[in-house]
C-alpha cells in the first residue's frame, strides 16, 4: 500500500467548501452531469474556503499561499510549521522569549531535552536558560544570555536546530 500523512483541517471550513460545491452542482445540473456529477470548481475558489491545514496545537504555517495551493493541486508537498512565540519585555532592557504554541505532534519534553543538550554542547551560545512554565497552556520561557541578542535571530537559530520548526 501507499502511506500518506494528511494534515488536519478545520471541519467548518471543509463543510463550507462542500456546501459551495453542492450549490454549484445545483445551479448547473446539465454541466455537472457532463463532468460525471463533479462540478468544476477553481482551486482558487476552494482556497477561499480552505486556506490551509488547521493544526490543533497551533503554531504558524510558514508557507506561501502559492505553495499551499500547489500542494493541494498536486497532492504532494509538505508544510513548514513553526512554534508561535512572543517577546516579553522585562525591566532594565531585559527580555524573555515565550513560546505559546508548539508545532503539531512535537512532544514538549523531548523538545526541552533537545534544547538543553544543545546548550550543554555550546551550540546555542545566545541562550542562557529554558524553563517550562506551562499549566493548561503552553509556556516555554527562553532566556537569552544578554539583552543585546536579537530575539528573531535567536529564534531562527532554534528553528534550524530543533523541532520548533517541522515539516508536516
What would you call each of these model-derived segments?
Residues 2-168:
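Intrinsically disordered, low-complexity regulatory segments
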Amino acid at each position: 500500500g501507499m502511506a500518506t500523512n494528511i494534515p488536519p483541517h478545520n471541519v467548518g471550513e471543509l463543510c463550507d467548501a462542500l456546501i459551495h460545491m453542492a450549490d454549484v452542482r445545483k445551479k448547473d445540473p446539465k454541466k455537472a452531469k457532463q463532468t460525471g456529477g463533479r462540478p468544476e470548481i477553481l482551486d482558487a475558489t476552494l482556497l477561499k474556503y480552505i486556506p490551509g491545514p488547521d493544526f490543533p496545537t497551533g503554531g504558524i504555517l510558514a508557507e506561501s499561499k502559492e505553495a499551499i495551493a500547489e500542494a493541494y493541486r498536486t497532492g504532494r508537498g509538505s508544510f513548514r510549521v513553526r512554534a508561535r512565540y512572543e517577546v516579553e519585555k522585562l525591566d532594565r532592557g531585559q527580555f524573555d522569549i515565550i513560546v505559546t504554541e508548539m508545532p503539531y505532534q512535537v512532544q514538549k519534553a523531548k523538545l526541552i531535552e533537545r534544547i538543553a543538550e544543545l546548550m550543554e554542547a555550546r551550540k546555542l551560545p545566545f541562550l542562557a536558560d529554558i524553563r517550562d512554565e506551562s499549566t493548561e497552556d503552553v509556556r516555554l520561557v527562553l532566556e537569552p544570555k544578554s539583552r543585546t541578542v536579537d530575539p528573531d535571530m535567536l529564534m531562527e537559530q532554534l528553528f534550524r536546530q530543533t523541532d520548533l520548526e517541522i515539516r508536516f
